Amino acid sequence: MKKTKKRKQSITLVEMMVVITLIGIIGGALAFNMRGSLQKGKIFQTEQNCARVYDVLMMEYASGNLSLKEVIANKEAILEDSAWCKEGKKLLKDAWGEDLLVKMNDKGDDIVVFSKKVRNEQRG
């Protein structure tokens, strides 16, 4: 009886290259899709920060101690001293690290809190 040696099958270089190429294509597609999701997440976080800043500043205005102009001028101190938020100065930054803008509306009876980045993203 003849003994036959079983030959071990190995992966060829071409097969390896095909697998690596497919992994690269799939990884690239996932990275491309995640970029849009990260941008949407930053916009959402910034909008939430704007809403919280607005709420805290309007609660201070509603207490009757300060006018709207004084509230806007002292926004950093108001947010730092507020029991409604832990790190008030961080709330005044958007997700990209830029300062939020706090202004009075055209009628002068309300506060507008916004980020230049978010406005630019929504326009373009």
Curated annotation (Swiss-Prot):
InterPro entries: N_methyl_site, Pilin-like. Keywords: Cell outer membrane, Membrane, Signal. Its main location: membrane. It is a peripheral membrane protein. One of its GO terms (cellular component) is cell outer membrane. It holds the Pfam family N_methyl. It comes from the Bacteria. It is found in: Cell outer membrane. The keyword Cell inner membrane does not apply. Residues 1-31 form the signal peptide. This is Putative outer membrane protein CT_569. It comes from Chlamydia trachomatis serovar D (strain ATCC VR-885 / DSM 19411 / UW-3/Cx). The lineage of its organism: Bacteria, Pseudomonadati, Chlamydiota, Chlamydiia, Chlamydiales.
